[in-house]
From Swiss-Prot:
Its main location: secreted. Gene3D superfamilies: Insulin-like. This is Insulin. Insulin decreases blood glucose concentration. It increases cell permeability to monosaccharides, amino acids and fatty acids. It accelerates glycolysis, the pentose phosphate cycle, and glycogen synthesis in liver.
Length: 113
């Protein structure tokens, strides 16, 4: 039943997007919350999609030299550690890509299984 509803919803959205004069194809859009999830269901279909809300970078730090992961103190000021920089880079995901910034259908496809 849910699969039938999803197919009907997908067809309705596709018809709206392809309707002459439709502005929905206009380009990148901000998609947040349930709108983002609905868009992923539409784009990915039966394949589903991948979402990992939080990744731990500690296992990645094992591949780096010991002093790369430690805090650096120069002139009495604490600088951002390498680990903090890694966490900021790894946490970038679909929310940052499609909610904070506009994204395209091709960006969404990167999160399909």
């Amino acid at each position: 039943m849910a699969a039938l509803w999803l197919q009907a919803f997908s067809l309705l959205v596709l018809m709206m997007v392809s309707w002459p004069g439709s502005q929905a194809v206009g380009g990148p859009q901000h998609l947040c919350g349930s709108h983002l999830v609905d868009a992923l269901y539409l784009v990915c279909g039966d394949r589903g999609f991948f979402y990992n809300p939080r990744r731990d970078v500690d296992p990645l730090l094992g591949f780096l030299p010991p002093k790369a992961g430690g805090a650096v103190v120069q002139g009495g000021e604490n600088e951002v550690t390498f680990k903090d920089q890694m966490e900021m880079m790894v946490k970038r995901g679909i929310v940052e890509e499609c909610c904070h910034k506009p994204c395209t259908i091709f960006d969404l496809q990167n999160y399909c299984n």
